[in-house]
Swiss-Prot record:
Domain of life: Archaea
Stored Gene3D superfamilies: Periplasmic binding protein-like II
Organism the protein comes from: Pyrococcus horikoshii (strain ATCC 700860 / DSM 12428 / JCM 9974 / NBRC 100139 / OT-3)
Gene Ontology cellular-component terms listed: plasma membrane
Residue positions where N-acetylcysteine is found in the record: 24
Claim: Lipoprotein is one of the keywords in the record: yes
Protein's UniProt name: Uncharacterized ABC transporter extracellular-binding protein PH1214
Keyword annotations: Acetylation, Cell membrane, Lipoprotein, Membrane, Signal, Transport
Function: Probably part of a binding-protein-dependent transport system PH1214/15/16.
Protein topology in the membrane: Lipid-anchor
Amino acid sequence: MSRKYLLSLLLVGALVISVVASGCIGGSQTPTSSPTKTQQVQELEIYHWWTAGGEKEAFDALAKKFEKKYPNIKIKANPVSGGGGVNLKMVLQSLMLAGKPPDTFQVHAGYEMARYIKANQLTPIDDIWTEDMKKNYPKVIQQMVIFNNHYYAVPINVHRANVIWYNKQIFKKYGIDPSSIKTIDDLFAVAEKLKENGVTPFALGDRNKWPATQVFEVMLVAVGGVDYYEKFINGEISANDPTLKKVLEYFVKYVEYSNPDHAAKTWDEACALVYKGEAAMTLMGDWANGYFKAKGWKPNVDYGAIPIPAGVYDLVIDTFVLPAKAAHPNAAKKWLSFIGTVEAQNTFNPIKGSIPPRKDAPADPYDPIQKSFIKELSSSETKLIPSIAHGSAVPEAFLADLNDIISELATSKDVNKAATEIINAMKKDLLPNKIKEWHLS
């Protein structure tokens, strides 16, 4: 056994021990109504990665609402820190191999689910998907949780990855009109102006790699358009493609306008730079909205949001699934049915910063930024794309390669090398593992 493999096993073991030792977190401590004597209290073990500001509060509110509805079920939440589930995936792998999965766990819609389905580690939940749900969930979102003609997950939210979050005080100070930013070139023109005035234009925190890949995917659609994005996730480009090299050059440009210590920071630490006025903007998903609100900032007063590029909605969808060997499948099914309701989604999403996937959810509880996103998502003119960085659009093995390539590019700035490595990774890990043909136009 290699030393590197041994260290990996020890890390996974330590993560499992830490989350198991954490006990019951995130549910309501005392049910509103007590179970009757004939009812036996059931435990519902849930694993998720919502630990940052806004995220934890959103899950706690959701858990409290569920326990009020089902007082004979007690939630045992095991949050595993690490944005995008970077650490949770390792913990789940260990639990699955041991044959002791949680009752349900968080996973992104799309390809990220495929590893569990291929290994027969998830149970189809067609019975959970009522006609009401099918009617009120957008078709593209339903397709992201259907494999082999079966539903495998229930989406709780819709996040948007392609958003620039900016400090309104800084923009006002330097006379920057946010409505002037429509394209990636507009964005870099603003970045240059800020840099000339001694302000760090972008806050980046790519210690966990995925935030850098997320910047890359936004550059991909901003530079190449939706048609080119589709070709990329279908593995239909070459190393000599001038558009790919331009995308990589724009990524390097973004990094050069960012804080020098980006590789040491997490996504929420990057958001903190914007909050503190140490950077003007950050390119991040709308979970940043929940972060800023948790800090006491008011949307469209202290900070604003600019979709980039305009007219595109980069989908990041959080779901929950039913493991095949769940200890409490009936309790898990109640949870899955619950999170598919308007009640649950309008409890969770206003706090989280995301929006509800259900089209019939009233927009009243949402802030102005979320309301504008709800309107865009429902517009026939908005182009919907699945996120690469968050495991929806491409096979997991290829995403792991891409994370490493983009992370290295952030330091090396070697565009030609990165382009060659991306195409090689497509041949090795995207095309052989391809199970979906995306049609985005």
